[in-house]
Amino acid sequence: DRNVVGGSACPPSMLAAFKNDYNCDTIHAWGMTETSPLGSANQLKAKHQQLSEQERFKLRLSQGRPPFGVDLRLTDEEKGNHEIARDGEQIGNLQIKGHWIIDSYFGKDESALTTDGWFDTGDIATLDEDGFLCISDRSKDLIKSGGEWISSVELENLAMGHSDILMAAVIAAEHPKWDERPIVIAVKKPDSTVTEQGVLDYYTDKIAKWQIPDRVIFVDSIPLSGTGKMLKRELRAQYGQVLLEQNPV
Protein backbone atom coordinates (compact mmCIF):
# COMPACT_ATOMS: atom_id res chain seq x y z
CA ASP A 1 0.00 0.00 0.00
CA ARG A 2 1.06 3.57 -0.53
CA ASN A 3 -0.27 7.09 -0.14
CA VAL A 4 0.71 10.48 -1.53
CA VAL A 5 1.27 13.53 0.66
CA GLY A 6 1.50 17.10 -0.62
CA GLY A 7 0.55 20.61 0.39
CA SER A 8 3.21 20.82 3.08
CA ALA A 9 6.15 18.73 4.20
CA CYS A 10 5.18 15.53 5.99
CA PRO A 11 6.93 15.15 9.39
CA PRO A 12 9.25 12.12 9.63
CA SER A 13 7.18 10.85 12.57
CA MET A 14 4.10 10.69 10.31
CA LEU A 15 5.95 8.81 7.57
CA ALA A 16 7.21 6.35 10.17
CA ALA A 17 3.70 5.89 11.59
CA PHE A 18 2.23 5.13 8.16
CA LYS A 19 4.95 2.54 7.56
CA ASN A 20 5.08 0.94 11.01
CA ASP A 21 1.38 1.03 11.92
CA TYR A 22 -0.24 0.50 8.51
CA ASN A 23 2.58 -0.95 6.35
CA CYS A 24 1.96 1.93 3.96
CA ASP A 25 4.71 3.71 2.04
CA THR A 26 4.33 7.48 1.76
CA ILE A 27 5.23 9.29 -1.45
CA HIS A 28 6.12 12.94 -1.03
CA ALA A 29 4.96 15.22 -3.82
CA TRP A 30 5.37 18.95 -4.28
CA GLY A 31 3.73 21.53 -6.47
CA MET A 32 1.88 24.83 -6.60
CA THR A 33 -1.14 26.27 -8.34
CA GLU A 34 1.44 27.95 -10.58
CA THR A 35 2.88 24.57 -11.62
CA SER A 36 -0.50 23.13 -12.73
CA PRO A 37 0.05 21.59 -10.09
CA LEU A 38 2.81 18.92 -10.07
CA GLY A 39 6.41 20.02 -9.60
CA SER A 40 8.00 16.82 -8.24
CA ALA A 41 7.20 13.39 -6.82
CA ASN A 42 9.34 11.00 -4.83
CA GLN A 43 9.95 7.72 -6.62
CA LEU A 44 13.24 6.10 -5.66
CA LYS A 45 15.65 5.03 -8.41
CA ALA A 46 16.69 1.43 -8.96
CA LYS A 47 20.12 2.06 -7.43
CA HIS A 48 18.48 3.09 -4.14
CA GLN A 49 17.30 -0.49 -3.53
CA GLN A 50 20.87 -1.22 -2.44
CA LEU A 51 20.56 1.26 0.42
CA SER A 52 19.59 0.30 3.95
CA GLU A 53 15.98 0.82 5.04
CA GLN A 54 17.11 3.77 7.16
CA GLU A 55 18.86 5.40 4.19
CA ARG A 56 15.82 4.87 1.95
CA PHE A 57 13.56 6.35 4.63
CA LYS A 58 15.75 9.45 4.78
CA LEU A 59 15.56 9.80 1.00
CA ARG A 60 11.76 9.45 1.07
CA LEU A 61 11.60 12.54 3.28
CA SER A 62 12.53 14.63 0.24
CA GLN A 63 10.01 15.95 -2.28
CA GLY A 64 11.53 13.81 -5.03
CA ARG A 65 12.34 14.60 -8.66
CA PRO A 66 10.52 16.67 -11.29
CA PRO A 67 8.50 14.86 -13.98
CA PHE A 68 9.44 14.92 -17.67
CA GLY A 69 9.06 18.44 -19.03
CA VAL A 70 9.90 20.25 -15.79
CA ASP A 71 13.30 21.62 -14.77
CA LEU A 72 14.40 22.82 -11.33
CA ARG A 73 17.33 24.95 -10.25
CA LEU A 74 18.63 26.72 -7.14
CA THR A 75 19.95 30.25 -7.17
CA ASP A 76 21.68 32.62 -4.78
CA GLU A 77 19.79 35.89 -4.78
CA GLU A 78 22.63 37.69 -3.03
CA LYS A 79 25.00 36.74 -5.86
CA GLY A 80 22.95 37.98 -8.77
CA ASN A 81 20.78 34.87 -9.15
CA HIS A 82 23.89 32.71 -9.60
CA GLU A 83 23.01 29.01 -9.95
CA ILE A 84 23.96 26.79 -7.00
CA ALA A 85 25.53 23.34 -7.34
CA ARG A 86 23.39 20.22 -6.90
CA ASP A 87 25.22 18.64 -4.00
CA GLY A 88 22.36 18.05 -1.56
CA GLU A 89 23.96 20.46 0.90
CA GLN A 90 23.84 24.03 -0.39
CA ILE A 91 20.49 25.77 -0.04
CA GLY A 92 19.12 28.31 -2.47
CA ASN A 93 16.01 29.87 -3.96
CA LEU A 94 14.02 27.20 -5.79
CA GLN A 95 13.06 28.11 -9.36
CA ILE A 96 11.10 26.04 -11.86
CA LYS A 97 10.60 26.02 -15.63
CA GLY A 98 8.39 24.01 -17.97
CA HIS A 99 5.68 24.17 -20.63
CA TRP A 100 2.82 24.11 -18.09
CA ILE A 101 4.47 26.42 -15.55
CA ILE A 102 2.89 29.86 -15.15
CA ASP A 103 4.32 32.75 -17.17
CA SER A 104 1.92 35.47 -16.00
CA TYR A 105 -0.98 35.93 -13.60
CA PHE A 106 -4.56 36.52 -14.72
CA GLY A 107 -5.22 40.18 -15.37
CA LYS A 108 -1.54 41.12 -15.14
CA ASP A 109 0.47 42.35 -18.11
CA GLU A 110 3.91 41.81 -16.59
CA SER A 111 5.70 38.46 -16.71
CA ALA A 112 5.84 36.31 -13.57
CA LEU A 113 9.20 34.91 -14.68
CA THR A 114 12.80 35.94 -14.20
CA THR A 115 14.58 37.60 -17.11
CA ASP A 116 15.92 34.19 -18.20
CA GLY A 117 12.53 32.45 -18.05
CA TRP A 118 12.29 30.79 -14.62
CA PHE A 119 9.51 31.05 -12.03
CA ASP A 120 10.70 31.75 -8.49
CA THR A 121 8.65 29.57 -6.15
CA GLY A 122 9.47 31.39 -2.92
CA ASP A 123 10.82 28.15 -1.44
CA ILE A 124 14.30 27.53 -0.06
CA ALA A 125 15.65 24.08 -0.90
CA THR A 126 18.50 21.75 -1.79
CA LEU A 127 18.94 19.54 -4.87
CA ASP A 128 21.20 16.50 -4.95
CA GLU A 129 23.12 15.06 -7.91
CA ASP A 130 20.15 12.83 -8.82
CA GLY A 131 17.79 15.81 -8.85
CA PHE A 132 16.02 14.98 -5.59
CA LEU A 133 14.46 18.09 -4.10
CA CYS A 134 14.36 18.79 -0.37
CA ILE A 135 12.49 21.93 0.62
CA SER A 136 13.89 23.57 3.74
CA ASP A 137 11.38 26.37 4.19
CA ARG A 138 9.48 29.21 2.62
CA SER A 139 11.85 32.13 2.15
CA LYS A 140 9.55 34.34 4.22
CA ASP A 141 9.53 31.79 7.08
CA LEU A 142 13.29 31.28 7.40
CA ILE A 143 14.70 32.58 10.68
CA LYS A 144 17.93 34.59 10.58
CA SER A 145 19.51 34.55 14.02
CA GLY A 146 22.85 36.25 14.51
CA GLY A 147 23.54 36.00 10.78
CA GLU A 148 22.80 32.24 10.64
CA TRP A 149 19.75 30.68 8.97
CA ILE A 150 17.41 28.39 10.91
CA SER A 151 14.71 26.30 9.19
CA SER A 152 11.28 26.60 10.78
CA VAL A 153 10.22 23.37 9.03
CA GLU A 154 13.01 21.35 10.64
CA LEU A 155 12.04 22.62 14.10
CA GLU A 156 8.36 21.92 13.42
CA ASN A 157 9.11 18.36 12.31
CA LEU A 158 11.06 17.74 15.51
CA ALA A 159 8.27 19.18 17.65
CA MET A 160 5.74 16.94 15.89
CA GLY A 161 7.86 13.96 16.86
CA HIS A 162 7.11 14.66 20.54
CA SER A 163 4.45 12.27 21.79
CA ASP A 164 2.50 15.06 23.53
CA ILE A 165 2.35 17.55 20.65
CA LEU A 166 -0.67 17.56 18.33
CA MET A 167 0.38 20.48 16.10
CA ALA A 168 3.28 22.91 16.06
CA ALA A 169 4.28 26.04 14.16
CA VAL A 170 7.66 27.73 14.44
CA ILE A 171 8.03 31.44 13.74
CA ALA A 172 10.71 34.10 14.00
CA ALA A 173 10.36 36.38 17.00
CA GLU A 174 12.27 39.64 17.21
CA HIS A 175 15.23 39.56 19.61
CA PRO A 176 17.21 42.52 21.00
CA LYS A 177 20.60 40.80 20.49
CA TRP A 178 20.21 38.19 17.74
CA ASP A 179 17.65 40.05 15.55
CA GLU A 180 15.46 36.94 15.36
CA ARG A 181 15.04 33.78 17.41
CA PRO A 182 12.74 30.78 16.84
CA ILE A 183 9.74 30.19 19.06
CA VAL A 184 7.30 27.27 18.96
CA ILE A 185 3.54 27.75 18.98
CA ALA A 186 2.16 24.34 19.96
CA VAL A 187 -1.11 22.55 20.60
CA LYS A 188 -0.94 19.78 23.20
CA LYS A 189 -2.66 16.45 22.77
CA PRO A 190 -5.73 16.00 24.99
CA ASP A 191 -4.89 15.39 28.68
CA SER A 192 -1.19 16.08 28.08
CA THR A 193 0.77 17.56 30.97
CA VAL A 194 3.92 18.37 29.01
CA THR A 195 5.63 21.61 30.01
CA GLU A 196 7.45 24.25 28.00
CA GLN A 197 10.78 23.05 29.37
CA GLY A 198 9.87 19.47 28.52
CA VAL A 199 9.48 20.37 24.85
CA LEU A 200 12.68 22.44 24.83
CA ASP A 201 14.59 19.54 26.41
CA TYR A 202 13.27 17.29 23.63
CA TYR A 203 15.34 19.28 21.11
CA THR A 204 18.59 18.57 22.98
CA ASP A 205 21.03 16.42 20.97
CA LYS A 206 18.73 16.57 17.91
CA ILE A 207 19.97 19.91 16.58
CA ALA A 208 22.73 22.41 17.32
CA LYS A 209 22.28 24.20 20.64
CA TRP A 210 21.98 27.62 18.99
CA GLN A 211 19.04 26.37 16.91
CA ILE A 212 16.95 25.31 19.91
CA PRO A 213 13.90 27.60 20.21
CA ASP A 214 13.82 30.25 22.92
CA ARG A 215 10.19 29.66 23.87
CA VAL A 216 7.33 27.21 23.56
CA ILE A 217 3.91 28.82 23.79
CA PHE A 218 0.93 26.50 24.18
CA VAL A 219 -2.34 27.48 22.48
CA ASP A 220 -5.73 25.86 21.97
CA SER A 221 -5.49 26.02 18.18
CA ILE A 222 -3.32 27.28 15.33
CA PRO A 223 -5.00 29.38 12.61
CA LEU A 224 -5.30 27.56 9.29
CA SER A 225 -6.07 28.65 5.75
CA GLY A 226 -8.93 27.21 3.72
CA THR A 227 -6.52 24.57 2.39
CA GLY A 228 -5.28 23.61 5.87
CA LYS A 229 -1.96 25.47 5.83
CA MET A 230 -0.80 27.24 8.99
CA LEU A 231 -1.22 31.00 8.84
CA LYS A 232 2.15 32.04 10.17
CA ARG A 233 1.60 35.70 9.37
CA GLU A 234 -1.17 35.74 12.00
CA LEU A 235 1.11 34.01 14.50
CA ARG A 236 3.91 36.49 13.79
CA ALA A 237 1.50 39.38 14.31
CA GLN A 238 0.42 37.97 17.67
CA TYR A 239 3.67 36.52 19.03
CA GLY A 240 6.43 38.16 16.99
CA GLN A 241 7.47 40.52 19.80
CA VAL A 242 7.10 38.18 22.77
CA LEU A 243 10.88 38.00 23.31
CA LEU A 244 11.18 41.80 23.29
CA GLU A 245 8.52 41.94 25.99
CA GLN A 246 10.50 39.61 28.25
CA ASN A 247 13.91 41.07 27.27
CA PRO A 248 13.32 44.81 26.84
CA VAL A 249 16.19 46.79 25.31
Which residues does each PLM region occupy?
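Conserved AMP-binding/adenylate-forming
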Residues: R2-N3, C10-A29, T33-L133, S139-L142, ...
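Active-site and channel-lining beta-strand-loop segments
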Residues: D71-E77, D220-T227
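AMP-binding/adenylate-forming catalytic core of the ANL superfamily
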Residues: G98, S104, I124-Q211, S221, ...
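Acidic/polar alpha-helix N-cap and adjacent early helical turns
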Residues: Q238-V249
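Conserved donor-binding loops in enzymes that form glycosidic bonds
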Residues: G7-S8, S221
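Hydrophobic/anchoring residues in structured secondary elements
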Residues: V5, V170, I217-F218
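Conserved beta-strand segments of alpha/beta enzyme cores
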Residues: D25, D71, M167, R215-I217
